[in-house]
C-alpha cells in the first residue's frame, strides 16, 4: 500500500526506538560530510570513462559495481577516482553464478542462502574486500538473499554463519559489510545482523526494493533499520501485482516511495552518508531519469 499514516513529525519521532543491540561502530566514510548525492555505476573495463560520466552529471560520490577484481585494475580505478574527484562509498558485489530476480528462482539463486553457490560467493566477497582495501573503498555491499524468516530453519543458521565469515573478513580489512535490502523483511534483517554479532555490519537501505519485493513500506522500515543505515539507494517502484514477479521499478517520484518523508527521517536520524541514485534501465532515458532524480532530491535535501 502507498506511504501513508501519521504526520511526519509524530511518525519520525519514533525512529530507532524499537531496535535492541548495538549499531555498527567501525568507522567508514559516512559521518564526515553532509548528506550528499551519489550514483551507483557499473565500472566495466574502463574506469576513466565510467567515472567521467558520474562527474559529467555533477555527482560527487559513487557505489561501484566491478566485473573485474584483478589487481591490475586497482591502479586505473584509483587514478580515475582521483582524476574525477569521485568519493567511492561502497564496492557492490554479486555472484558468481546465476541470480534470478523473481519470487520462485530468487530464493534458489540469490546471495549466500543457496548452498550450491555459497562457498564460491564467500570466496568472491573476500576477493572483493581485498580489492576494495587496495582501492580505498570503505565498504563491501551485497544481497545476502532470501534470508529465512524462521530462525530455526537450518538455512537461516547456515546463512548467518556465512555472513559472519565475510563480515569478519571485511572487518580485518578495515571495512564495513553492508546488506542490500530487498529479499528479507526488516525484522529478519535486524535478527540476522544481531545474530551475526559483529560491529562492522550495516544496511544499504534500498527504498524501492522493499516495495518491489513486497516486504515493507520503507518509511515504516526505517523504525527498525534506522540505526544500521550506512547507505541509501534512491530508487522508486510499485508493489508486485502477481505472486511470481517483482514489482515494477519506475522513475523517482512516480512510485510508492514517500521521498519527502524519507529524507526528513534520514535528517532526524542524523544520517550523514550518501543518497545514491539507482535507475536500472539503460540508454538515454536512464540519463534523463538520473538528472531528474538529482534535481528532485537536491531540492529535498536542501530543505
Residue ranges with predicted function:
Residues 1-23:
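N-terminal export signals
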Residues 8, 45-48, 102-202, 287:
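Active-site acidic/histidine proton-transfer and metal-coordination neighborhood
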Residues 26-46:
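Boundary/entry segment of secreted carbohydrate-active catalytic domains
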Residues 29-32, 51-57, 71-96, 127-136, ...:
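Acidic (Asp/Glu)-rich catalytic clusters
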Residues 35-41, 62-64, 88-93, 140-142, ...:
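Hydrophobic faces of well-ordered beta-strands that scaffold small-molecule active sites
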Residues 41-48, 64-76, 147-151, 182-187, ...:
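Acidic-and-aromatic substrate-binding clefts and catalytic sites of carbohydrate-active enzymes
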Residues 61-62, 91, 160-256:
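Acidic/histidine-rich catalytic cores of soluble enzymes
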Residues 286-303:
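C-terminal helical cap(s) of enzyme catalytic domains, especially alpha/beta-barrels
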